Amino acid sequence: MAFFFNRGRSRQPSDVVRSIKDLLLRLREPSTASKVEDELAKQLSQMKLMVQGTQELEASTDQVHALVQAMLHEDLLYELAVALHNLPFEARKDTQTIFSHILRFKPPHGNSPDPPVISYIVHNRPEIIIELCRGYEHSQSAMPCGTILREALKFDVIAAIILYDQSKEGEPAIRLTEVQPNVPQRGTGVFWRFFHWIDRGTFELSADAFTTFREILTRHKSLVTGYLATNFDYFFAQFNTFLVQSESYVTKRQSIKLLGEILLDRANYSVMMRYVESGENLKLCMKLLRDDRKMVQYEGFHVFKVFVANPDKSVAVQRILINNRDRLLRFLPKFLEDRTDDDQFTDEKSFLVRQIELLPKEPIEPSRSAREPSRSTANTTTVA
């Protein structure tokens, strides 16, 4: 099918790449920016056809391979990531399509299990991923950058770059050889900006940032479990403050639901046990049960039940539950009682009522084994 792209005035992939790079450099200059936008859009549209083909003709594998090599040689992916928010609307869409296709492109007879663009980013240009994250600083680039990031996040090495990078703008991004999983983060890296983007962004930006944030935290479980264990205090301080207590209903509800998913995932058992030891975390969850909005109450319930179902509650958690026993026993039977078709929810409420009834009169020090759980007990606190 290569003839489709070589007939007439069509140019070689390397020519298109160099032309786009030159136009991107001119786009930075206010005096020429408006003049190059149309030509840049045309060039990106042509590149999209090279990687995507048309309904009538498939893209040429050899031509896509040549295009990828030229883009890597000219560092065009980085330049596109930096400039994405300045591109015209259609050009942003085309850039998103180009990125998404080449991120998963594998040449015939390739030896690496990962696509070459992913390997290149990880070993040579992780700054591409960091700049795509920074696309959330601009409403124009938020959604295309988010779509590209979620395609890249299918690979755990990309998640590691986002989680562990602490570079400032203009500095080199982290390499995998520099990752120190046991060293707590300072809260200055790009990952921590997601809390701001989700909490303070426009509705569309916030929603897209949350989707990417959730992908980072739920897709590669072994990576994230270690990260949360090392950065537990700072992460959940940010999560509880900016997301669970967000003024946005959508952010609040989605964040509580995500919190429940994280805590009830077997891979995060140790993280869950640390979270439910905290009396302050329990107070926050009990506050959610009294929210004016039923879906916030419902999602809050699925976090609250983890505290109550834990057979080895901390003294702080026991004290709060014991002090509020009578009120909880009056409150829970009537809690969301209109959910008559949800048998599991009804059974869980009954279970929690029974657990609260069985609480001792005074807190009892939990066993040492509860504070140092083994993997064999990983599901003892989950309410079915």
UniProtKB/Swiss-Prot annotation:
Family: Belongs to the Mo25 family.
Regions of compositional bias (Basic and acidic residues) in chain numbering: 362-374
GO biological process, one term: regulation of DNA-templated transcription
Matches recorded under Pfam families: Mo25 (PF08569)
Coiled coil: none
One Gene Ontology cellular component annotation held by this UniProt entry: cytoplasm
Keyword Aminoacyl-tRNA synthetase: no
GO molecular function, a single term: protein serine/threonine kinase activator activity
Taxonomic superkingdom: Eukaryota
Region annotation Disordered: where it falls in the sequence: 362-384
Task performed by this protein: Required for conidiophore development.
InterPro entries per UniProt: ARM-like (IPR011989), ARM-type_fold (IPR016024), Mo25 (IPR013878)
Location of the protein in the cell: Cytoplasm
Organism: Emericella nidulans (strain FGSC A4 / ATCC 38163 / CBS 112.46 / NRRL 194 / M139) (Aspergillus nidulans)
UniProt protein name: Conidiophore development protein hymA
Keywords on record: Cytoplasm
SUPFAM superfamilies named among the record's database cross-references: ARM repeat (SSF48371)
Gene3D superfamilies named among the record's database cross-references: Leucine-rich Repeat Variant (1.25.10.10)
